[in-house]
UniProtKB/Swiss-Prot annotation:
Name of this protein: Polyribonucleotide nucleotidyltransferase
Main location, first listed in the record: cytoplasm
Residues in S1 motif domain copies: 624-692
EC number: 2.7.7.8
Annotated gene: pnp
Record-level Gene Ontology MF annotations: 3'-5'-RNA exonuclease activity; magnesium ion binding; polyribonucleotide nucleotidyltransferase activity; RNA binding
Provenance organism: Shewanella halifaxensis (strain HAW-EB4)
Keywords per UniProt: Cytoplasm, Magnesium, Metal-binding, Nucleotidyltransferase, RNA-binding, Transferase
Record's subunit section: Component of the RNA degradosome, which is a multiprotein complex involved in RNA processing and mRNA degradation.
GO BP field: mRNA catabolic process; RNA processing
Entry similarity comment: Belongs to the polyribonucleotide nucleotidyltransferase family.
Length: 704
């Protein structure tokens, strides 16, 4: 019998019991943790390579998150009946886990590390994201791989003015906020949220609340780590050659300082390249055996130091702006003639061409996940082609970054979208990033708001987004509004805020250092508010509210109500009736169980014809009414006449004419159109008709 030594740690966390177990499953991995929150269970494995690949100049961390359908007691769809490529939701969760753990690996660590999170059981009320992050933190902490954790994670809701820790799926329905926060015992590292235009102080309070509550997680992982007691790898950061550092500083510092006074991005990049290459050539001429990778790394560090030093010293930013200035804006709506809505939003060297397409309910995205099936009427797709940064590259299916940026923009806009009752259309937004130098996701938010208004979508109000940055050295710090790409990767904090004039709709924050206090975040959020209002003012000059009507090229949806019992009549046998209706009128028809009928067409006459025919099909036969009917069958005792679609009645032989009729065929033939009057509808729905009563009476003879 194989001997196993399980180590288990359980603790109460909000409404749920969390259990972390190791030592039983996946024992050949560097670490494996079976983490549970209620009945939602994930298996997290961590494997790291002991040796670094020669010549590597980056940290190859991979986070794979996979939801197995068996976790929810389901069998996958499709021909192969097995899980395929990651869904959008799985990709987003993988990014959510990657972002806070990446900065906790030590500088200079470049060994390959792979984290695999597998959802093996799921309670439909408890989403796997939080326990996946907790399990990942625990697995990394006990793996022996150099890791400056542990990390805690929490989800925060906000209902009736109260914060809720790790709300259930049902509780989130009524929540004005869904915020995920991760951090160490002393610092917040990552925030991801969607909100119903909440004030800055409520959002900041949620971040602080979530960070405070997750300390119990961090303590439990520390106790698990002590019990497992696995030796940490014998790894040390590469020793820096101080002589080489000094030489590089002498060769390149002045040139880099001058290069970063060039405001145009492409020209600046070119000059930075010239300075770096000159320094490298000088060093290689002096020592041909010098490590070029080390030189490149030190040049990058010097570049970062130069840029940060200028900002902290109070000098103008890279492009000449003051810290709180937003780049020049150029905003246009209705730029494409045949799309249903469009906009071109330009902020400095960042530009988004955004289109809006309206469709019917049939065009909505149907999603079948382990948490259940649902329909998404509002879709936002973000594309980042290589030409947007002046490069060549692969073009194809969206990458993780594009999926993540698209979802962030979606969160920013979703709070102002109309309900299905207010606007019965499916909406697809596509944001094409045509230029990029910082914060293209927030440009997508602004462009989406404009395109929706141009399409006539009745959104509640305009939404704008802004990306903020931070440079902190000791106690000195500078908050930057509308950061450039260079300021993003050279700074200490990157956070993106989308919202209306009334509050925040989406907040994403990634913090790379410790020591970011609540006060610093508060200053940053207030500065972001000022920038957001400035952008909204410019946007409102281009288009201040949604257009009064949708585009002439968009399908117009007309809604009518019918008796729910008549739905089967509209559908017909095997769908024959509705198929004929849509083909012959050129419309799209959708039926709901409550009798709601939606007819969509860009042709008004086609819509009217479809409505007329549906009303005919669903009309009730009225006693005493005269109808134009058509003979469909002749029998010995009379004739059957269709008076409405699917409604036949019998004209008895005695009701065909005033005189006595011996043979029905002498008076009627199949296909003949006749006027008939409804005499009776019996309890079984059988209709008795009369031609005799429908015929105009002969004038009475004139009196003698």
């Amino acid at each position: 019998m194989v001997h196993v030594n399980p180590i288990v740690k359980s603790f109460e966390y909000g409404q749920h019991t969390v259990t972390l177990e190791t030592g039983v499953i996946a024992r050949q991995a560097d670490a494996a943790v079976l983490a549970s929150m209620g009945d939602t269970t994930v298996l997290v494995t961590v494997v790291g390579k002991k040796f670094e690949e020669p010549g590597r100049d980056f940290f190859p961390l991979t986070v794979n998150y996979q939801e197995k359908t068996y976790a929810a007691g389901k069998i996958p769809g499709g021909f192969f009946k097995r899980e395929g490529r990651p869904s959008e939701g799985e990709t987003l969760t993988a990014r959510l886990i990657d972002r806070p753990i990446r900065p906790l690996f030590p500088n200079g660590f470049k060994n390959e590390v792979q984290v695999i999170i597998t959802v093996v059981s799921v309670d439909p009320e408890i989403s796997p994201e939080v326990i996946s992050m907790i399990g990942t933190s625990a697995a990394l902490s006990i793996s022996g791989i150099p890791f400056n954790g542990p990390l805690g994670s929490a989800r925060v809701g906000y209902v009736n003015g109260e914060y809720i820790l790790n709300p259930t799926v049902s509780q989130l329905v009524d929540s004005q906020l869904e915020l995920s926060v991760a951090g160490t015992d002393s610092a917040v590292l990552m925030v991801e949220s969607e909100a119903s235009a909440l004030p800055e102080e409520v959002m900041l309070g949620a971040v602080v609340y979530g960070h405070d509550q997750q300390q119990v997680v961090i303590q439990a992982i520390k106790e698990l780590q002590a019990e497992v007691n696995k030796p940490v790898w014998d790894w040390a950061a590469p020793v820096q050659d101080e002589t080489l550092v000094a030489k590089i500083k002498d060769l390149a510092e002045a040139g880099l300082t001058e290069a970063y006074q060039i405001e145009v991005k492409q020209d600046r990049y070119a000059q930075v390249g010239v300075v770096k290459n000159a320094a490298k050539e000088a060093l290689l001429a002096e020592n041909p055996d010098a490590n070029t990778r080390e030189i490149d790394g030190l040049l990058g560090s010097l570049e970062k130091k130069v840029v940060r030093g200028r900002i902290i010293a109070g000098n103008p930013r890279i492009d000449g702006r003051e810290p709180d200035m937003v780049r020049a804006l150029n905003v246009m709506a209705g730029v494409l003639p045949r799309t249903h809505g469009s906009s071109l939003f330009t902020r400095g060297e960042t530009q988004a061409l955004v289109t809006c397409t309206l469709g019917t309910e049939r065009d909505a995205q149907k999603i079948d996940s382990i948490m259940g099936e649902y329909t998404n009427r509002f879709m936002l797709h973000y594309n980042f082609p290589p030409y947007s940064v002046g490069e060549t590259g692969m073009v194809g299916s969206p990458k993780r970054r594009e999926i993540g940026h698209g979802k962030l923009a979606w969160r920013g806009i979703n709070a102002v979208m109309p309900t299905a009752e207010e606007f019965p259309y499916s909406v697809r937004i596509v944001s094409e990033i045509t230029e990029s130098n910082g914060s293209s996701s927030m440009a997508s938010v602004c462009g989406t708001s404009l395109a929706l208004m141009d399409a006539g979508v009745p959104i509640k109000t305009s939404v704008a987004g802004i990306a903020m940055g931070l440079v902190k050295e000791g106690d000195d710090f500078v908050v930057l509004s509308d950061i450039l790409g260079d300021e993003d990767h050279l700074g200490d904090m990157d956070f993106k805020v989308a919202g209306t004039r009334d509050g925040i709709t989406a907040l994403q924050m990634d913090i790379k250092i410790e020591g970011i206090t609540k006060e610093i975040m508060q200053i940053a959020l207030q500065q972001a508010y000022g920038a957001r209002v400035h952008i909204l003012n410019v946007m409102d000059q281009a288009i201040g509210s949604h257009r009064g009507d949708i585009s002439e090229h968009a399908p117009r949806i007309t809604t009518i109500k019918i008796n729910p019992e008549k739905i089967r009549d509209v559908i017909g046998k095997g769908g024959a009736t509705i198929r004929a209706l849509t083909e012959e009128t050129g419309t799209t028809i959708e039926l709901d169980d409550d009798g709601t009928v939606k007819i969509a067409s860009s042709n008004g006459e086609a819509t009217k014809e479809a409505i007329r025919r549906i009303e005919e099909i669903t009309a009730e036969v009225e006693v005493g009414t005269v109808y134009n009917g058509k003979v469909v069958r002749i029998v010995d005792f009379g004739a059957f006449v269709t008076i409405l679609p699917g409604k036949d009645g019998l004209v008895h032989i005695s009701q065909i004419a005033e005189e006595r009729v011996a043979n029905v065929s002498d008076y009627l033939e199949v296909g003949q159109e006749v006027k008939v009057k409804v005499m009776e509808v019996d309890r079984q729905g059988r209709v008795r008709l009369s031609m005799k009563e429908a015929a105009p009476k002969a004038d009475a003879p004139a009196a003698e």
